[in-house]
Amino acid sequence: MKRAFVFPGQGSQTPGMGQALAAAFPAARQLFEEVDEALSQHLSRLMFEGPESELMLTENAQPALLAASLAVIRVLEREAGFDIARQAAYVAGHSLGEYSALAAAGALSVAEAARLVKRRGQAMQKAVPVGVGAMAALLGLDIEAARAVAEAAAQGQVCDLANDNSPGQIVVSGHRGAVERAVALAMERGARAIMLPVSAPFHCSLMSPAADIMTEALAETALEAPRVPLVANVAAATTSEPAEIKQLLVEQTTRMVRWRESVLLFAANEVEEVVEIGAGRVLAGLVKRIDRTLSARSVGMPAEVEALVQVL
């Protein structure tokens, strides 16, 4: 069966994440210890025990999600002889998850990936003062209608399309006032709209200071060609070229995540199953809304790991 392996982004973090996996598999415990050591931080304790308020901070949530995903990959490798180059036709990650995908595919070491996403989280949080920015999900509009709403709402401020998640689920990001106007305009057009509980306006032009920091961070990073083609967020196209991947990771900081198109690329290339690796079930749910011909599963708990091993 042809499979794509995908990796979740911010929003999927919850206290207790990874704890059952660490209890069941020594390989997962070892992975969490490696991340703790790379960051000089007891991140695994924060993941397992909270407090939730600290885990939700962008600079902690991002490496925590990376660690949760890579722990699953490590267990599959150690317990089942999993080789991503043989088992995956593609890898992709939603926003932060793109770094997890690259590490899983051998382009980044665990330590390098952990340090990069910690720096990314800090840079994104500092780019815009708390309260200045906001994000909202527009539900029931197609991409062109959402773009028209964002343009009308801007009024000299920033209101960009941040995520094209699935048909009828578009996220906008920018100045709080502009995003609130977008919510009102979307509702006037018969859509539902929800302000999102985020600490910064991700994937919009207000993140330019963070993009500058990531340009510097990635220039200092040894990134190898992934062993599996990456479907990049901002291109919704495959790449395996390290210099191009670095540029796309920088662009991803300020540009829209083209998730719907990425999943359609899987379907167009005869992928049959999309496997979400790590915390939560967000991406598997989106896959099913994008293309019902694709099967999708989430793998983060010990029983889910064991079930996947049976079919690989």
Residue ranges and their predicted role:
Residues 267-270:
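Non-catalytic positions within long, well-ordered alpha-helices that form the structural scaffold/packing
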Residues 3, 7, 237-238, 259:
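Short, flexible segments with low predicted structural confidence
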Residues 10-13, 39, 105-255:
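Alpha/beta catalytic cores of group-transfer enzymes, especially the acyltransferase/condensing modules
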Residues 311-312:
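Post-His helix in hydrolase/transferase enzymes
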Residues 1-146, 196, 273-306:
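FabD-like malonyl-/acyl-CoA
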